[in-house]
Amino acid sequence: MRDADDRRAALWQGRMAERAAILALRLKRYAILERGYRIHGGEIDIIARRGDTIAFVEVKARPTMDGALQSITPQKRRRICRAARVWLASHPYAAAMTLRGDAVFVAPWRWPHHVAAAVELDFG
């Protein structure tokens, strides 16, 4: 029972972090194209566009901002790239745009911290 409660709490925390990240991105004039984009073997929390840039955004909720960037593991980066490749294949207009892997870090009682180009995209 405790494990189920912990999973529910983590899921709720993740949803709230994504909502905060979306608000922060919208205030920076990003248009949200997708939220919770998932494929087999990959996922992207938010896909956003501003001007000629498409940002594949990973959202991380942490108790503090310390070490938040390190929480994006090489395995997570591969999953983001895999999902981005599939998304790009179904959105050919995006091929001519600048593609970037961003992150938004969310901590309690702090404004979300958006880091552009925090995730190295490797489409090779």
UniProtKB/Swiss-Prot annotation:
It comes from the Bacteria. One of its GO terms (molecular function) is nucleic acid binding. NCBIfam families: PRK12497.1-5. Belongs to the UPF0102 family. This is UPF0102 protein Msil_0293.
